[in-house]
Regions:
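Acidic/histidine-rich helix-loop elements
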Residues: 120-137, 220-227, 278-287, 314
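Active-site metal-binding motif and surrounding structural segment of the metallo-beta-lactamase
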Residues: 129-179, 194, 265-271
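Cap/insert and terminal regions of metallo-dependent hydrolase folds
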Residues: 8-12, 28-38, 42-46, 142, ...
Length: 351
């Protein structure tokens, strides 16, 4: 009997270990990002990228958060509320921003159409049947997009790098894609081509005098459990004849805001994240909160800012309307600078 019981325990342990090893092997093969190979820099140690300032919480902190979550309210929005079809092109010195959802915006400037972190999928997850799902439809129908010339992908998290959407854009529009180091190989693995990868402060040149510079952000990267920080993360500055536009991607607070503002002054418009910031003890290193977004507006010297990264996916403990409420309080406390909250699908010409 003792030997039989021992055999059962050993068999169960072997099955558990085998299952864990199997899951690890599957996630490495199908989900993990390929490793970047390049020279050591102040933000790459030869194996993994890092922030110039402290980066992200430990796995233990993540488990603590998961065990003690206090989620804010996220009501359902079952009926899509699509905005009007954007104009085909915008020129004559105009700058038009359309907020589509989450960090997906359409930037139209100098007859060039640019998408940031495009996401039209129902879930932002390695699989289609589980993981964070959207609480409202994208504000613009995919088929209503104008011709897309350029796509900016800030990092490899699923709510920013949606390979299904990128494949659809490639098929329909054939845009150039600009992304930080290491992400081009990951995209090619998923059948997405025409991606140019750059390091912080490097610049890609496009039609109509448009340049795109990869700029620092304080964040991290991961597609699976085993590939933390193999690929770089970033923001972007679009430099056009009609002015500079800054898209922050995902970022915590850091000195990079002032540095970007100094290098690209004056910045005509900034797109700054305001959501997924609670609880602060956990999110603070990688996500600014609404008050810090207002601070970033001033540090960058922005003429106008637009809020992004809210109202679509419940990724932090903040509720759907908490970011807007907290942003309005911070704006009122700082003299109400020009910082816009657009409705999903709303487009607006900026000064």
């Amino acid at each position: 009997m003792f030997e039989y019981a021992l055999m059962r325990k050993t068999t169960k342990a072997a099955i558990a270990i085998g299952s864990a090893l199997g899951v690890a092997a599957i996630e490495r093969i199908f989900f993990a990002a390929p490793r970047w190979r390049g020279a050591v820099t102040d933000h790459f140690d030869g194996e993994r990228f890092r922030n110039r300032e402290d980066g992200w919480q430990s796995e233990g902190s993540f488990l603590k958060w998961m065990a003690n979550r206090e989620r804010g309210a996220w009501p359902e929005h079952p009926e899509p509320a699509y905005g009007p079809r954007p104009p085909e092109r915008v020129g004559d010195g105009r700058l038009r921003i359309t907020f589509i959802n989450h960090s997906t915006t359409l930037i139209q400037i100098d007859d060039v159409n640019i998408l940031t972190d495009p996401v039209w999928s129902e879930r932002v997850s390695p699989v289609s049947f589980a993981g964070p799902r959207r609480h409202r439809a994208p504000g613009i129908r995919f088929e209503d997009l104008p011709p897309i010339d350029l796509v900016l992908v800030s990092h490899n998290h699923y709510d920013h790098m949606d390979v299904a959407t990128l494949r659809a854009l490639q098929k329909r529009h054939r845009p150039a894609i600009v992304t930080p180091l290491g992400n081009a190989a990951l995209l090619r693995r998923h059948g997405v081509h025409d991606a140019f990868e750059l390091d912080w402060w490097e610049t890609a040149h496009h039609a109509n005098g448009i340049n795109t510079t990869i700029v620092p952000a304080r964040h991290f990267s991961a597609r699976a459990m085993s590939d933390r920080n193999r690929n770089l993360w970033s923001g972007f500055v679009i430099s056009a004849p009609s002015g500079h536009v800054y898209f922050a991607g995902d970022t915590g607070w850091g000195n990079h805001f002032a540095e970007i503002g100094k290098r690209f002054s004056p910045i005509r418009a900034t797109l700054l994240p305001i959501g997924s910031y609670m609880p602060r003890w956990f999110m603070q290193p990688a996500h600014i909160d609404p008050a810090q977004a207002v601070d970033a507006h001033f540090a960058l010297g922005a003429q106008t800012s637009v809020a992004v990264h809210f109202g679509t996916f419940a990724l932090g403990d903040d509720g759907e309307y908490d970011p807007i409420h907290d942003l309005n309080e911070a704006l009122a406390a700082n003299g109400n600078p020009p910082f816009l909250v657009l409705g999903q699908g709303e487009g607006r010409d900026l000064p």
